[in-house]
Each structure stands twice: as structure tokens, then as C-alpha cells.
Swiss-Prot record:
Domain of life: Eukaryota
Entry comment describing in which tissues the protein is expressed: Ubiquitously expressed.
Cell compartment(s), UniProt: Late endosome membrane; Lysosome membrane; Cytoplasm, Cytoskeleton, Spindle; Cell projection, Axon
Naturally occurring in which organism (per UniProt): Homo sapiens
Subunit field text: Interacts with PLEKHM1. When GTP-bound, interacts with RUFY3 and RUFY4, but not with RUFY1, nor RUFY2.
Function: Plays a role in lysosome motility. In neurons, mediates the anterograde axonal long-range transport of presynaptic lysosome-related vesicles required for presynaptic biogenesis and synaptic function. May play a role in chromosome segregation.
Protein name listed in UniProt: ADP-ribosylation factor-like protein 8A
Biological process annotations from GO: anterograde axonal transport; cell division; chromosome segregation; protein transport
Intramembrane segments: 1-19
GO MF annotation terms: alpha-tubulin binding; beta-tubulin binding; GTP binding; GTPase activity
Length: 186
């Protein structure tokens, strides 16, 4: 009965109130961050992406939720900016190229260094292993192990294996983020 009431209340709120969430998307260069933003925004995959220089900000509306998405460059010279753009957001989305196993160790180190920053304590993290359509790509279980995600105890953390190219698991990623946005405000 309570679950039914909560669903009815959510539906009623959706009629009258727009929800907003702010996300920061970080990860090493060529992991698919900008592609992810474009797939969410337009449903289109573009093979010819140019690496992000600095950052891009995009607002995307899905249903009654407006998502303000900060897409931060992944080259070494931009990584010092990650912390600043991650402060106070609803969630941090950390993109990993799951098919490039040579960069997994560096990706793990960058993630853990970022999450060690005191200003980011408690902010939830969604780790996305992109490019699951490529041969040799790590699955969720392997990503959790190689990225040492089980060591992250001070916040909510979730991991999905996705393919921006094939649009695999993009919908559940959005559902998690939107649901998470609702639970953070409750």
C-alpha cells in the first residue's frame, strides 16, 4: 500500500514539479564521455568525435528531469580540474574504456585519487565501462575487480557495462541517475 502511495505521489509531483540534477562526467581521454553525452541528448552515435578541450556543459531534459552535465576533458593536463567540477553535484559519472586494458590501471588510480579529495566525500559515483561491444572488453564483474571498486566504502557506488555505439544499457544508466537524484533530495 505504501509503495502504491509513493508511486502516486511521484506521479503527482511529476505533473507539477520539474526535477533538476547536476552531474560531472570524468575519465581518461578517449573513454567515450562526449559520445555518452551525445547519445543521451540525441540518441545518435557519431564515430568522429574530437577530444574535449577543457570542458563542455550541456543541459538535457528527459521527461520531467533536467540534467546539467559537465563533460570534462580526460587528457592529463585537464585532470586537475576534475575535483572543482565534481563538488556539490548529484553524482559523479566516471567513464572507463573497458576495451583498453592497458589504461585500466591509470584509470583506477585517477578515480581513487579523485575520490580521496575531502570536498567530494559522500558524492555517489557511477562507473561506466564503455565499449562493451569491442572484443576483450571487461564486463561489470571484471571492472569492479580491476578498478578496485569494492575498496570505496564512503559513498554509494554503482557500475554498469555499456556501449554508446550500440546504445546498450544507456537506459538503465539514466534510470539509475534519475532515481538517484530523487533519493538524494528525499
Amino acid at each position: 500500500m505504501i509503495a502504491l502511495f509513493n508511486k502516486l505521489l511521484d506521479w503527482f509531483k511529476a505533473l507539477f514539479w520539474k526535477e533538476e540534477m547536476e552531474l560531472t562526467l570524468v575519465g581518461l581521454q578517449y573513454s567515450g564521455k562526449t559520445t555518452f553525452v551525445n547519445v543521451i541528448a540525441s540518441g545518435q552515435f557519431n564515430e568522429d568525435m574530437i577530444p574535449t578541450v577543457g570542458f563542455n556543459m550541456r543541459k538535457i531534459t528527459k521527461g520531467n528531469v533536467t540534467i546539467k552535465l559537465w563533460d570534462i576533458g580526460g587528457q592529463p593536463r585537464f585532470r586537475s580540474m576534475w575535483e572543482r567540477y565534481c563538488r556539490g553535484v548529484s553524482a559523479i559519472v566516471y567513464m572507463v574504456d573497458a576495451a583498453d586494458q592497458e589504461k585500466i590501471e591509470a584509470s583506477k588510480n585517477e578515480l581513487h585519487n579523485l575520490l580521496d579529495k575531502p570536498q567530494l566525500q559522500g558524492i555517489p559515483v557511477l562507473v561506466l565501462g564503455n565499449k562493451r561491444d569491442l572484443p576483450g572488453a571487461l564486463d561489470e564483474k571484471e571492472l569492479i575487480e580491476k578498478m578496485n571498486l569494492s575498496a570505496i566504502q564512503d559513498r554509494e557506488i554503482c557500475c554498469y557495462s555499456i556501449s554508446c555505439k550500440e546504445k546498450d544499457n544507456i537506459d538503465i544508466t539514466l534510470q539509475w541517475l534519475i532515481q538517484h537524484s530523487k533519493s538524494r533530495r528525499s
